[in-house]
Amino acid sequence: ISPFKFLRYSFIVGSLEYPSQSYMNEKWYPENTGSNDDSFFFQNNYTLNMVDLDFKHLHIDFGSSVIWPNRFAMGYMFPLANFVEYQNHVGDADNLQMFGDIKLKYQGLGEIWVSLFLDELDLSTLLKKDVFTYTRDMFAYQFGAKYVIPKLPFATLSLRYTKIEPYCYTHQSINYTPWFNHYISQNYTNDGYNIGYYLDPNSDELRLDFNIKQKKNLNLASTYQFIRHGTDYESQ
């Protein structure tokens, strides 16, 4: 929905696919579950709402999303609902996220931006200065810049750094959620893959891109990536 040229609101809701554990985690299922079917543990829906503000030299967007076990939850199906407020009323049984981007841009020169994704954050750790070591601080961030190269046809050079903190995109398995009497996995994934950035948790990336449009139907691009990945921490 775009009531004004500078304002746009987006909303999506749907069901997520569950992964096939037969090739991802062999013998993962406990023997006493009574069912060795993926749908026994993965019954999730996904909802997202986002606001975009786009001006001549400034772009801002922010929003929230939620992974929630399959049930009738009107608050997650209504476009203008506040997901955080709704979960506080129905119980802490869902996986909430918040995100935002700020970009400064100047036509003919380039742009700079900062992005933040909050999967979970303990505000008390900000005062203790251990936000980067506390296991329940699960977030990702990116900052970068793009430069328009003069005297070359539609040529740009961009540099960005991305960091995915450990446990980001993961979530503790919740037992006895509404309508379920067993553990349900609510990771930020679809069909076993992250819904967010393509990096795995506990990774960072430095990326350099060069793009040039020589002709109408000819684009040339070159990319350099330096990716580091740390220890894979287990999650429930």
Q: Where is each model-derived feature located?
A:
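Exposed, low-structure sequence patches enriched in small/polar residues
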Residues: 53-236
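A conserved hydrophobic secondary-structure block that centers on an alpha-helix together
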Residues: 1-2
